[in-house]
Swiss-Prot record:
Belongs to the glycosyl hydrolase 3 family. NagZ subfamily. This is Beta-hexosaminidase. Its EC number is 3.2.1.52. GO terms for cellular component: cytoplasm. Pathway: Cell wall biogenesis; peptidoglycan recycling. It comes from Xanthomonas oryzae pv. oryzae (strain KACC10331 / KXO85). Keywords: Cell cycle, Cell division, Cell shape, Cell wall biogenesis/degradation, Cytoplasm, Glycosidase, Hydrolase, Peptidoglycan synthesis.
Amino acid sequence: MLLIGVAGTELSAQERDWLQHDAVAGVVLFKRNFGSRSQVAELSAAIRAAAPRPVLICVDQEGGRVQRFREGFSALAPLQSFGAQYAQAPEAALAAARAHAQLMASEVRASGVDLSFAPVVDLGRGNRAIGDRAFSDDPQIVATFTRAYVQALHGAGMAATLKHFPGHGTVLEDTHVDHASDPRPLEALQAEDLVPFVAGIEAGADAVMMAHVVYPQVAPEPAGYSQRWIEQILRGQMGFRGVVFSDDIGMAASLSAGGVAGRVHAHLDAGCDVVLVCHPELVAESLQAVQGRRLNTAALIGLIGRGALGWDGLLAGTDASFTAPLSAHFGTTA
């Protein structure tokens, strides 16, 4: 299955045709797809109307610098801010993180979007792409926040996606633009980077997004298309039974798998349920690549939200217990 990117704030005729394809699981939205709160709700409705089956609509609405929807949405703090607060006031920090998850999920669902790929559970150890997107550099603190965030997302009716497995935070390179390799053995990763993923899986996380990072002491290829990482470690040793997403196959670190078709097949063959094709110019070739493949369409049903909440429904359901932890940490809408 593929999650595809579309070009703008409205669907083109070609994009409507793509949504008819059996292999299209849904759409990933970006800043380029956002004009306003009402517009993104209309786009979400148009995507669903164009598809002959239920589809998944996703976004990265983490907070901080990775927040695709801004105008009319709450300005969400980066996750690192909660980790910084934790040393002085752990219970308050966890309460604020739960409120962050509930607010984000509620606003995203009110726009007709099913899920934000969240939370980031990488360790915050200097990676150029992760930065303040991570809760902390301490595995146990990240694990504690991961449990709280997953539970809060579920309470708001949104599936939780742990990213980026098995841990992107320790390498320096940004895999959007460069190849990345982590030389540590599996035992070192299990003692540190995998700790938050174990916590998230135990908390009932619904999905995991893979990292385009190579761990040569574990497997020769990037984790995103490594059967050892996905089938043997994540599913076999760690017992994960949810959906496995690739990261975007347009990123530089995925190019080692070859051309577009090679990248799609490599990720699916390794055990990814869904491949992210975020660049519209890669969609047609990706669809051609999966023609004739057997597709796991049932895997995504549990990720689709409990129906579009709508902004009226969100506001009607908001009470003081929900907004109290938010005002100090988030302030006003962006």
